[in-house]
Amino acid sequence: MYDFLRTDKVRLPSFSTTQTIVDGINLDETLKGYRTLAVRGRETSSRNIQVHDKNSYINSTNPFLDGAILLGSNIPAKNILVEYQVSTKNYRDQTELYELLNYYINKPLVKLIFTDDLKYFYKGTLANMGEIETSLEHKGEMEFAIHDPYKYSNEIFIEKFAGSGEIKRSMLYPVALEWVEIKAKTNTDKLIIKNDSTGRRIIIDSNITSTDRIKIYFKEFLVEQNGKENISATMDITSDYEDFEINTGDVISTNIDADIELSYRERKL
């Protein structure tokens, strides 16, 4: 005789190997009856390609005009699909579960972490919620639009230089800075922070003394002097503020004698 396994009666583990964390809230642990089944859409990213047909404006049978000319390409936004299971004892519990789930996920932008990749996070917006079955135990899907296709490290890395220095950390992609702080050792009326490897510069037109600290917060577009005075208006209009990035091997310097401290998050696809 054979012992057949009743797959419809197999007890599932209380938590899956991958759990979903939204803005620091672990849904699998917080929502009684909720379980993440699978997460799809993180693995690879294809590129959007812009091409020009070689023969589009020329009526010719020349074989060298076959194909197309690549004009450019970029990595598009991606969608992450979270498949989940809900199992409750009654519909009241199920209603409360979905009320909490909506509260956690239905915001303009949420921070998504999955427990099989705890060192990194995505930023996304709930784009679609699959149709909910009218049963106490059912499966569902929620889709998040990831506008920036990269995932970012939870850890913030800090580099410190005296005068100038090279980015030693090995990174796969260039990254924007979280902030950079300059501790001046001389007086100046113009501070220039430069990535010598790319030529990008940040220019501050302000009277700075040998004891001043200038800190630039890139996401907030904020420039502080000595931790209190907002001098953002002194940033020169020719600064490469939005394009200032660093990568492995880049050399960062200033035009004055100063200590440099900068921070950033690593990013990956």
Describe the role of every protein-language-model region.
Residues 152-269:
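Intrinsically disordered, low-complexity segments enriched in serine, threonine, and glycine
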Residues 63-91, 136-149, 251:
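Oligomerization/assembly interface segments of phage tail-like spikes and tubes
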Residues 1-59:
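Polar/acidic, low-complexity leader/linker segments enriched in S/T/G and N/D
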Residues 14, 21-39, 121-127, 201-207, ...:
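Short amphipathic beta-strand/extended segments with alternating polar/hydrophobic composition
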Residues 4-9, 83-127:
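Short, acidic/charged, Gly/Pro-enriched secondary-structure junctions
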Residues 74-78, 104-106, 134-138, 172-176, ...:
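Solvent-exposed loop and beta-edge segments used for protein-protein assembly and interaction
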Residues 56-59, 63-67, 92-99:
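N-terminal, charged/glycine-rich beta-strand/loop interface patches
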